[in-house]
From Swiss-Prot:
Inducing factors: Expressed in the late phase of the viral replicative cycle.
Functional summary from the UniProt entry: Component of the virion core. Participates in virion assembly.
Name of the featured protein: 39kDa core protein OPG130
Species whose genome carries this gene: Vaccinia virus (strain Western Reserve)
Region (Disordered): 1-33, 93-112, 149-188
Post-translational modifications: Its phosphorylation state is regulated by the OPG054 kinase and the OPG106 phosphatase.
Domain of life per record: Viruses
Pfam families per UniProt: Orthopox_A5L
Keyword annotations of the record: Host membrane, Late protein, Membrane, Virion
Keyword set includes Magnesium: no
Subunit structure: Interacts with OPG136 and its cleaved form.
Gene: OPG130
Length: 281
């Protein structure tokens, strides 16, 4: 990751050389560092999201490839027995001997029927899911999420600037298997508030005092009239009064100049009128 940050930083510096006419201003080192960290975090986030997508696809393919095992149906072998045919009784002759009857052939029908009854008495209502092998849930997705959250916490160094904080994305896996990532919103710094207070003076003028208040508590240029010392406040008012007096003097001088110019113009017009009257006489 350090190599990627150095590579991105070197690429940004080489793409905008100082000798270029389009180069306006060199960025602050802290800003460059924050941008490099943000680029690294975004690359990590995209990398882990790609890992999660690939792992979920592999898990789905593994589950889809496992088909339920069909239960084995017992095979019953029943040996057909020959139907005994009635044989006529032998005719006993005086000179013949009685034939000895052959022993009756034994069959195994009773054993086959007992096997059939045993199979039928078994519980055949067992669900097909019980015949499937026990599936052990894969912990690869949870491992990737844990590693991503750990890297989010360890790779973010404490910034020396308290004015800006980079957002950190946190991913969690829900009970239904879905993955949700949340990124907190960072409020940008507000522009400073400039207020001007004008107070009329007994001489007819106006004294205006301008104060700048920054909503950021860590800014060094924050100025609040409530926290300002009385000596500083009086010096600011005195300075504004001197400036106002100088502007008033300039205005009065301009008015006097305008009045003198107007008087001379009127005198010239009167002289022209008198000369025109003399010419008519």
């Amino acid at each position: 990751m350090d190599f990627f940050n150095k590579f991105s930083q070197g690429l940004a510096e080489s793409s905008t050389p100082k000798s270029s006419i389009y180069y306006s201003e060199e960025k602050d080192p802290d800003t460059k560092k924050d941008e490099a960290i943000e680029i690294g975090l975004k690359s990590q986030e995209s990398y882990y999201q790609r890992q999660l997508r690939e792992q979920l696809a592999r898990d789905n393919m593994t589950v889809a490839s496992r088909q339920p095992i069909q239960p084995l149906q017992p095979t019953i072998h029943i040996t057909p027995q020959p139907v005994p045919t009635a044989t006529p009784a032998p005719i006993l002759l005086p000179s013949s001997t009685v034939p000895t009857p052959k022993p009756r052939q034994q069959t195994n029908t009773s054993s086959d029927m007992s096997n059939l009854f045993d199979w039928l008495s078994e519980d055949t209502d067992a669900p097909a899911s019980s015949l499937l092998p026990a599936l052990t849930p894969s912990n690869a997705v949870q491992d990737i999420i844990s590693k991503f959250n750990k890297d989010q916490k360890t790779t973010t160094p404490p910034s020396t600037q308290p004015s800006q904080t980079l957002p950190t994305t946190t991913c969690t896996q829900q009970s239904d298997g879905n993955i949700s990532c949340t990124t907190p919103t960072v409020t940008p710094p507000q522009p400073p508030i400039v207020a001007t207070v004008c107070t009329p003076t007994p001489t007819g003028g106006t004294v205006c005092t301008t104060a700048q208040q920054n909503p950021n508590p860590g800014a060094a240029s924050q100025q609040n009239l409530d926290d300002m010392a009385l000596k500083d406040l009086m010096s600011n008012v005195e300075r504004d009064m001197h400036q106002l007096q100088a502007e008033t003097n300039d205005l009065v001088t301009n008015v006097y100049d305008a009045r003198e110019y107007t008087r001379r113009a009127i005198d010239q017009i009167l002289q022209l009128v008198k000369g025109f009257e003399r010419f008519q006489k």
